[in-house]
């Protein structure tokens, strides 16, 4: 993390349990981020918070530290049964729940507290067997949690700490009735520690907080800055015919370490993926109908660097928490202004620099004024030289083919860039495509 992202507040200065301090030290966490520095003093006094912070600001560690410390500081209810977790952390997507669980296990190893994770789409019986052994901290998506509650597999009447992460996305995905269902079955709000985090503290999010929390204090990090200063934004105005050549040319010119390409529809994502695969890129495709096991496999490949570019719709990408994404490409400008913020927030995380490139084509250019009004600044326009776009682009692959694994897809940075795919002719590097 860069110094600009961190505060001067050290974790060591907080009165945390020694087991929590030990885990933080072993994980390399010394200084707090702003959201951690502001929220932890409140939470350690056992007061509720409703926190607003951009994605990638460290809010996950903030509520995990508070949750672990609270459970270690609070007596276990005498009547607690094996199927009653002491804390529950609700997330809008499987991927976010999985990431939270990974971070939680880092903090758990010296505490003796058991972490369990549940989510829909797979592993119902496997997850149930874990719950049958008892967990202290339950992390998961609301639908699967409710399934287990209704079947009596778990009981939430001994909950001592609650976290609702990405509450605004919970509303977007229609999960609020599920959340209220669970809250009504928990102890009174005054007898538990309640934490809510959201990218935006809209009126509906604040209403949820005040309905189910105990006079939460509002914590805001740069609420007027919708996008991170660590992200360099630019926008191009390509014709429909030049969108794909421009994308492929910029990918070669930028040579991103790890990139996400967003498009507005499943069909468009499949088209983009087909061209990327045909041009020799190691690309993964995430749309709403990708099976869960394949989805997790693609995300694991992307995280490990076996895939360099992820092509995704907004629905499929919600809740993704992947580090070191260097570039985000908006092949289509989103129809929803908040989706623009969430998209580019995949890069420039944890103090790192990021790049956001958007295309304002004939079909979606009308979305730009609303987006710029929402983010409260104009996106710098970049022109390009049409004659400098790649003209040796191989044809796209068929969508039913599995991503190829032969040497054409091996991006060996030591020996230069791919040489024109199937044509094997050197691409032009004598002309820059960007003109300020």
Swiss-Prot record:
Pfam families noted in UniProt: DEAD, Helicase_C
Domain Helicase ATP-binding: 40-219
Keyword RNA-binding: yes
Domain of life according to the entry: Bacteria
InterPro entries, alphabetized: DEAD/DEAH_box_helicase_dom, DEAD_box_RNA_helicase, Helicase_ATP-bd, Helicase_C-like, P-loop_NTPase, RNA-helicase_DEAD-box_CS, RNA_helicase_ATP-dep_RhlB, RNA_helicase_DEAD_Q_motif
Compartments where located: Cytoplasm
Reaction(s) catalysed (UniProt annotation): ATP + H2O = ADP + phosphate + H(+)
Location of the Helicase C-terminal domain: 243-390
Region feature (Disordered): 392-436
Entry's Gene Ontology BP terms: RNA catabolic process
UniProt family annotation: Belongs to the DEAD box helicase family. RhlB subfamily.
HAMAP family named among the record's database cross-references: DEAD_helicase_RhlB (MF_00661)
Quaternary assembly: Component of the RNA degradosome, which is a multiprotein complex involved in RNA processing and mRNA degradation.
Annotated protein name in UniProt: ATP-dependent RNA helicase RhlB
Gene giving rise to this polypeptide: rhlB
């Amino acid at each position: 993390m860069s110094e600009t992202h961190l505060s001067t507040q050290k974790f060591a200065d907080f009165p945390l349990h020694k087991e929590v301090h030990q885990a933080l030290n072993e994980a390399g966490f010394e200084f707090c981020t702003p959201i951690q520095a502001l929220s932890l003093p409140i939470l350690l006094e056992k007061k509720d918070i409703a926190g607003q912070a951009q994605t990638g600001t460290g809010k996950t560690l903030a509520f995990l530290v508070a949750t672990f410390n609270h459970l270690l500081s609070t007596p276990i209810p005498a009547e607690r049964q094996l199927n009653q977790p002491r804390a529950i952390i609700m997330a809008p997507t499987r991927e976010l729940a999985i990431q939270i669980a990974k971070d939680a296990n880092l903090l758990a190893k010296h505490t003796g507290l058991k972490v369990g994770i549940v989510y829909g789409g797979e592993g119902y019986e496997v997850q149930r067997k874990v719950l049958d052994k008892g967990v202290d901290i339950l992390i998961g998506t609301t639908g699967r949690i409710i399934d287990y509650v209704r079947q009596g597999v778990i009981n939430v009447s001994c909950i001592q700490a609650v976290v609702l992460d990405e509450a605004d996305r919970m509303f977007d995905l229609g999960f609020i009735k599920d959340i209220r269902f669970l809250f009504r079955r928990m102890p009174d709000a005054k007898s538990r520690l309640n934490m809510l985090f959201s990218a935006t503290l809209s009126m509906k999010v604040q209403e949820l907080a005040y309905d189910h929390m105990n006079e939460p204090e509002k914590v805001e990090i740069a609420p007027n800055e919708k996008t991170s200063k660590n992200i360099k934004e630019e926008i191009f105005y390509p014709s429909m015919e030049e969108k794909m050549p421009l994308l492929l040319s910029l990918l070669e010119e930028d040579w991103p370490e790890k990139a996400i390409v967003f498009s507005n529809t499943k069909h468009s994502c499949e088209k983009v993926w087909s061209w990327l695969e045909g041009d020799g890129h190691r690309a993964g495709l995430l749309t709403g109908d990708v099976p869960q096991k394949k989805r997790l496999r693609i995300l694991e490949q992307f995280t490990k660097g076996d895939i360099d570019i992820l092509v995704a719709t907004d629905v499929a990408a919600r809740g993704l928490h992947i580090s070191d994404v260097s570039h985000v490409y908006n092949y289509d400008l989103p129809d929803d202004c908040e989706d623009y913020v969430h998209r580019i927030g995949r890069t420039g995380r944890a103090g790192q620099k990021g790049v956001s490139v958007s295309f304002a084509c004939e079909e979606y250019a009308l979305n730009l004024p609303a987006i710029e009004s929402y983010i409260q600044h104009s996106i710098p326009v970049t022109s390009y030289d049409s004659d400098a776009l790649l003209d040796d682009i191989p044809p796209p692959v068929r969508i039913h083919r599995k991503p190829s694994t032969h040497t054409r897809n091996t991006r060996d940075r030591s020996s230069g860039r791919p040489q024109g795919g199937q044509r094997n002719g050197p691409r032009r590097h004598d002309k820059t495509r960007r003109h300020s």
